[in-house]
Amino acid sequence: MINSIRIGTRKSKLALTQTNLVIEQIKQHFPNINCEIVEITTSGDLIQNKPLYDIGGKALFLKEIEQALLNKKVDLAVHSLKDVPGIIPKDLSIEAVLEREDSRDVFVCLTHKSIEELPKNAVIGTSSVRRKLCVQRMRPDLEIIVFRGNVDSRINKLINKEVDATILAYAGLKRLNAFNPEYCHLIEHSQMLPCIGQGVIAIEIRKDDHDMIEICKQINHLPTFELIKPERALLEYLDANCRTPIGAYSKYLDNGDIQTDFMLGNLDGSKIAFHTEISNPKTSKESGIKAAKVMLLSLS
């Protein structure tokens, strides 16, 4: 077994926090392995003044890290699974995930506790077309503006009254110890299905790296790995990008089956389709493909 691992990650506070969670898992199983964090600046980090869908999508948060992986400058990469496209380079694999955190979104507002309570024509900041479509469904009167940046910068924009509210993932807020119940309010899945893979930390490796495969076997949280299959199958089948309003959430039923709620909107946001599938873990991927076909038909 190797004695050191180079781990590629973005430089953000959240990315480094998540990388350290992965290192904790590695150390539990392989206490003698030295883990070196390799911080990589991605295109998505550099370009902050444009919506992701105008500059290449969430893959911009992975491109340089995946290139470092392919060039053997790092041994494994840590990502937020919600940033990972449905189709990744053929020589790479999402080989492990950590246990999923609560996947709900959070309404962040200094003056009101829910989207419904906002005054008429209030301004919400988000760069997510999924969140935008869900908000418009609830409150078509609200103004929605493009809003990017890390957690601290977004909250500062709230304080400076640039917007009335924003929406963030609970998982990121919790990992940064930034969830404050005074102005952070959970949004239920019935109102806003999460991004595919939201709340999951993913480990990506080269398919031919047998040492990393063995390490991933030990740290992989299998129940979460099975849950994300139908969600990721939808994403892969549609080859969806940041212009596509898409969401999904999987959970286990008492009998061990997986229930997945899916959402898909058309590109201009004028229509939205929902679909639910119940599947056996062995066939859960097929349920994502079926959901894609059903929702595409309803939107046509």
Curated annotation (Swiss-Prot):
SUPFAM superfamilies: Periplasmic binding protein-like II, Porphobilinogen deaminase (hydroxymethylbilane synthase), C-terminal domain
Cofactor(s) this protein requires: dipyrromethane
This protein's GO CC annotations: cytoplasm
CDD domains in alphabetical order: PBP2_PBGD_2 (cd13647)
Residue numbers of S-(dipyrrolylmethanemethyl)cysteine PTMs: C242
Subunit record text: Monomer.
InterPro entries: HemC, Porphobilin_deaminase_cofac_BS, Porphobilin_deaminase_N, Porphobilinogen_deaminase_C, Porphobilinogen_deaminase_C_sf
UniProt name for this protein: Porphobilinogen deaminase
Biological or metabolic pathway of the protein: Porphyrin-containing compound metabolism; protoporphyrin-IX biosynthesis; coproporphyrinogen-III from 5-aminolevulinate: step 2/4
GO molecular function: hydroxymethylbilane synthase activity
The keyword Transferase is assigned to this record: yes
Species this chain originates from: Rickettsia bellii (strain OSU 85-389)
Keyword check for Transferase: yes
Catalytic activity field: 4 porphobilinogen + H2O = hydroxymethylbilane + 4 NH4(+)
Further information: The porphobilinogen subunits are added to the dipyrromethane group.
Domain of life (superkingdom): Bacteria
One matching Pfam family: Porphobil_deamC
